[in-house]
């Protein structure tokens, strides 16, 4: 499901693996025909994040950079359009040796090639690949097919993590697991079984719900990770550690931690909590309004830069939005 925090969950998972002494890189696979995000409306798509080599991509790439303390490149981003463009260019250059080039297997094979290439370039122990969109969408089926093929090729080196939302309807007051059950069944129909489920919700996951997800989704209770809303996103890696997410990941790959370097991240979160003296900062922009809603996603990196600068000075930033179009009139 879009907008539930898959990007932050990916970045946070990478952070806890970094804290264990492993090298990590991250990729985003967007299910758009657009070759990159440069032509997309920021109100609809959110911020267009630009990598150091000029690639215009999804805002989640910014979260990866901030959490992993790394500079990512065009090799860390792909769209359906970009993958198709690459395959067609290879066909024109006769790189397929006269074969009939088909959607399957050639498109998923190009996706897999890009994932492995990102690992080689970063010399990474872990490559975290976020597949955008929602399970069941026809747009991301080729990325799911690539995941299936990769897991079939290297079952001991591939893990599938499902980020699923568990709603708590106000009129009922009870957390519902049905959307997660259906998401897993849709994955099963694509030949995939999640190894871990990150259960997103407004409140922590309780034991009865964990057991229910375990039974209906064919997964160990220990691999159902509670991922409730946090006061600020940089708290999420610490929440994942409390849920022993890194332990479950390393167990899957039969690895042991190299280090325990969580102190620096704890210090960051402590500084954020202690930054209480407010400072007002205005941001002038035009990509705010979408129907009846006011969104700030178009300026995500600006917002995060302001927050980090304020926290460094032990201040709590209070951001005010100034619509440039109103002042132009």
What are the residue ranges of the model-derived segments?
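Flexible phosphate-sensing "switch/lid" loops adjacent to ATP/NTP-binding sites
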Residues: 1-329
């Amino acid at each position: 499901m879009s907008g539930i925090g898959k990007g932050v969950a990916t970045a946070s998972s990478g952070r806890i693996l970094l804290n264990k002494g492993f090298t990590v890189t991250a990729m985003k696979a967007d299910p758009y025909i657009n070759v990159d995000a440069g032509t997309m409306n920021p109100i609809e798509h959110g911020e267009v994040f630009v990598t150091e080599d000029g690639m215009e991509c999804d805002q989640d790439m910014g979260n990866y950079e901030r959490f992993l303390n790394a500079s990512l490149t065009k090799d860390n981003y792909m769209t359906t359009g970009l993958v198709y463009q690459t395959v067609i260019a290879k066909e024109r250059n006769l790189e397929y040796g006269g074969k009939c080039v088909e959607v399957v297997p050639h498109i998923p094979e190009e996706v897999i090639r890009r994932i492995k290439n990102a690992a080689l370039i970063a010399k990474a122990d872990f490559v975290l690949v976020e597949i955008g969109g929602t399970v069941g969408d026809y747009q991301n089926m080729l990325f799911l097919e690539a995941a299936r093929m990769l897991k079939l090729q290297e079952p001991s080196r591939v893990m599938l993590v499902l980020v699923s939302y568990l709603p708590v309807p106000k009129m009922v007051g009870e957390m519902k697991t049905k959307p997660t059950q259906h998401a897993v069944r849709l994955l099963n129909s694509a030949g995939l079984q999640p190894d871990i489920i990150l259960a997103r919700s407004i409140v922590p996951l309780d034991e009865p719900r964990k057991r229910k997800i375990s039974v209906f989704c064919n997964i160990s209770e220990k691999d159902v990770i509670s991922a409730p809303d946090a006061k600020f996103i940089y708290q999420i890696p610490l929440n994942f550690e409390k849920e022993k997410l890194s332990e479950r990941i390393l167990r899957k790959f039969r690895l042991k931690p190299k280090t325990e370097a969580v102190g620096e991240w704890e210090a960051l979160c402590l500084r954020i909590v202690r930054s209480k003296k407010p400072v007002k900062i205005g941001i002038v922009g035009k990509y705010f309004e979408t129907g009846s809603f006011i969104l700030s996603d178009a300026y995500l990196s600006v917002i995060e830069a302001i927050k980090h600068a304020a926290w460094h000075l032990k201040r709590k930033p209070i951001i005010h939005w100034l619509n440039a179009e109103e002042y132009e009139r």
